[in-house]
Each structure stands twice: as C-alpha cells, then as structure tokens.
C-alpha cells in the first residue's frame, strides 16, 4: 500500500503526542517493492555429463560466481545481459502462512526417495535385491515429515508473498513469465525499470534445457525465479529447447508415458496394456535428471546459496509454471503460475506434500488461468485436438494449491482456442481489464467452475473437437479484446479486479487408468 509523505511523518510525531501504546509490528502487512538488474545465470548440458551445469554471472565477468566448474566464455559476452529501462513496474506484497517441513528436503526427488525407503522398510524388502529402485536411490538421512502430524514435523511460517488481490502485481509477474521466453535484449522484452532482470539461465546458443531469468530487489530481500514454458509446435515457434520441452510435457502431463494410442511413441516404458500403467516405473521416470523439475532443484539450491536471507518466489507460464509449482511445493516457496497444465498428477507421483495434510491455502501455490485455454483446463486432448496433432499428450487437468480462474468464456464470450494459451494474449486481453466482482447473494462463479469440473471439461472438449471436425477453426475466433463493462463515468482501477482464489478439491485425473505393479 502506498503511504503519502505526511502520513509517514505523522507516524514519527504521534508517539510524542499520544499516550503510550503497545509497540506496532516492524513492517506493515502490505507493502510495495521494486527491483534492479544485478546478475545473469546460465545452465547447459556439457559433453559427457549426466547432470546439467549451472553458472552465475554478475554484470562484470570479473565478478562471476560459478556454481560448477564451467568455462565462462560459453555463456557469452556482456552484451547478452539485459539493460532494462522504462516504465516503473512494482509488486505489492503481503504476509501469508505457508506450511513447511521443519527439516528442508535436499532435492525435489527427496520426497519420492523417502517414500520408497519407508515403503521398503514397512514391507521388509531388501533394497539391494530390489530391481524396482534402479532410478530412485534411497536417501541417507532425510525422511519426509508425516503430514498426519503437522504440529510435530511441520511449521506454519509467515512469509512475504505477492499480493494477488492486486491486479498490477498479477500483471507484473505475468510479464516476468513472458520475459523468460526471450533472449535478454531481444525482441519481445517487457522493459522493467527498477526491477532486476538478473541471471538469464539457459540462454547459451546450444543449450536445450531449463531456461529463464531471475529477479531481485535492491536489498536482495526478495528474489523471483521465472521459468520458460514450452517453445515447440502448437505452443510456440520452436527453438533449441523444443525437443526437451515436448519430452517433459509428455512425461509430466500424460496419464502413462504419452501412450495415447498405438500410433504414439511412449516417452517411458511403463505401459502395461489396455488402461494399465506401472506406478513405480512412472515415479522412476519422473526423477530422471532430464526432467525439468529435478533440474530446477539445482537452480533453486544455488539461488538460496547466493541469497541465504532472501525470500524466494517462483513464476512461469505453461510448462514453466508447472515446474515452478513443483519446486515451490518441494521447498515451501511461494509460486504463481500462468496457464499451467494440471500439475497435480506429477506432484502426486513425486510424493510432494498435498491435501489433506497440506491444505491448499497453506501451500503457497497459486495458478492463474482462464476458461478458454484448453491446455490449462485439461481439454486439449483427443484425436481432433491441436495438442494431439502436434504430438503433445496434455491429459492432466487438476492443479495443486489455489486457482484464480478467469471465466473468459462467460464474461468475454470467448470460444475455446489453443491460441489463447499464449502469455501475451493473457497479459493483453485477460489481465489488462479489471475483472467484475461477484454480485452479493450469488454463489461463486469460480467455485462452481471448479466443482463442476467434469461437466465443464466435457462440454469444452466436445466444443473443441467439433470445431476441428467442421474445419472452421479460423472462423471460430471469439477472443478479441472485449472485456468487462465499466460503470458510466467510472475509471479503470489499477488495483483490485482479480477473481478470488479457490481450490480444485473435486478434480480427478486419468480416471480411466489403473496404476499398479504389472511386471
């Protein structure tokens, strides 16, 4: 909240003019912060290496900090670093409780490792003779806390998070997510004055792995990691990360290794015929180092090492949003995603903390998306969908944490179209307008949208398939800039106008499939 100068001055004079009172808190519940550039961050797979290499680069190469032994020349010259000036963009913050384990896990896969270790111990299985643990090595010390006893092994910690009731904050984070797609200094950047466009990780010419940027405020008290989404086929213009993007989309968001039908090549060997799939096999595949969720562990750990006293946030669009959410769930970090596919499916396979032990409002995860996006809504599947045609098995629809759902189909009259998935469309045509508040006495539109997920998804999928069958998708283009109507004489408020977050409590993925041990 912005406090004018006279009010700030009065806060110093009041103690002398009034009777003593209990001391106030050191910081207000809501405040606004801004950022400036400081670093660059690179990530790549070097020759004959099974794990990715990370490096951090300051504005001056002489001040570079290496996370691993990696030649600085491979990143590029100083001209690749962002030089951002222009409009001031700010983020409003507030305090929020987030549930975290008292002992922090070393990695994302530590949750799966701990689950496997406890299962083996409970069943009396000797790990040395068990062939099901080739990919998941068991942890030496860390054990996942019991969600049934939150008071003993968990802490509800008050942390600073982005205030997502503030529309400008939602827009600023979305622009950071958009910037994760673009090479620093290249076309498409949103200029962020007083924000730190730092560490553009993964932008080496031959890098095909995790990409994005890191932002930090002037005091290094808040650091934001933005992660790039998919850059291939139906979702973008391609690029060096296209192959890895598609592989990870199909591994994370498909029911069983992207084995959609006989014509598809699976991304793992877990299919057991019919609608059966190997559960342990899927879990092993998800902890592979080629998966962005595990690569993100190295990124998060290095950022926390560089900024040990900072609050770390994550944000991203599409695949980048899902990866941000998985990292946030693993380490108890706030994450805001945009148009993310449903990532409850991979989160459950990684045994990350989920309800009922982890309440949605204490997870720190918030998903922002709209009802005309078939990918985020989980309906971009089936033989007539654009995702199927491009080779993407986007079969999941359920999200962790809380959801801010923009009902663009009802309010704006949009039709379901994969092109509305692009982050630029979301920023310019969804977030730019203040959203209408719910009329008093009426039940929540967002609660209804989530509670009736199956019915809504089936209707949207049928409409999407029908549009392609008619071959009139170019005519079926109902998502122009038509926003909520303003009151006569009213102004466009900069803040507010954001739907209320709700949890997707009744959502179920892959209901046709049966998961178990079929070997």
Curated annotation (Swiss-Prot):
**Topology, Cytoplasmic side:** 1-5
As its record notes, the protein acts as a catalyst of:
a triacylglycerol + H2O = a diacylglycerol + a fatty acid + H(+)
Taken from the record's topology, the Lumenal segments are 27-519
How is this protein positioned relative to the membrane? Answer: Single-pass type II membrane protein
GO MF annotation list: phospholipase activity; triacylglycerol lipase activity
Q: Which residues are glycosylated?
A: 48, 133, 196, 220, 302, 309, 361
Keywords associated with the record: Autophagy, Endosome, Glycoprotein, Hydrolase, Lipid degradation, Lipid metabolism, Membrane, Signal-anchor, Transmembrane, Transmembrane helix
The UniProt entry, under Pfam families, shows:
Lipase_3 (PF01764)
Provide a GO CC annotation, any one: vacuolar lumen
Localization per Swiss-Prot or TrEMBL: Endosome, Multivesicular body membrane; Prevacuolar compartment membrane
**Region Disordered, annotated ranges:** 481-502
GO biological process terms, semicolon-separated: multivesicular body membrane disassembly; neutral lipid catabolic process; pexophagy; phosphatidylserine catabolic process; piecemeal microautophagy of the nucleus; vacuolar protein processing
Asked whether the UniProt record includes Acyltransferase among its keywords, one would answer no
Q: List the disulfide bonds.
A: none
Active-site residues (renumbered): 318 (charge relay system)
Question: Which InterPro entries is this protein grouped with?
Answer: AB_hydrolase_fold (IPR029058), ATG15_Lipase (IPR050805), Fungal_lipase-type (IPR002921)
Q: Where is the major localization of this protein?
A: membrane
The UniProt record lists the EC number as 3.1.1.3
Q: Which family does it belong to?
A: Belongs to the AB hydrolase superfamily. Lipase family.
Q: What does this protein do?
A: Lipase which is essential for lysis of subvacuolar cytoplasm to vacuole targeted bodies and intravacuolar autophagic bodies. Involved in the lysis of intravacuolar multivesicular body (MVB) vesicles. The intravacuolar membrane disintegration by ATG15 is critical to life span extension.
Q: What is the name of the protein in this document?
A: Putative lipase ATG15
Q: Which organism is it from?
A: Cryptococcus neoformans var. neoformans serotype D (strain B-3501A)
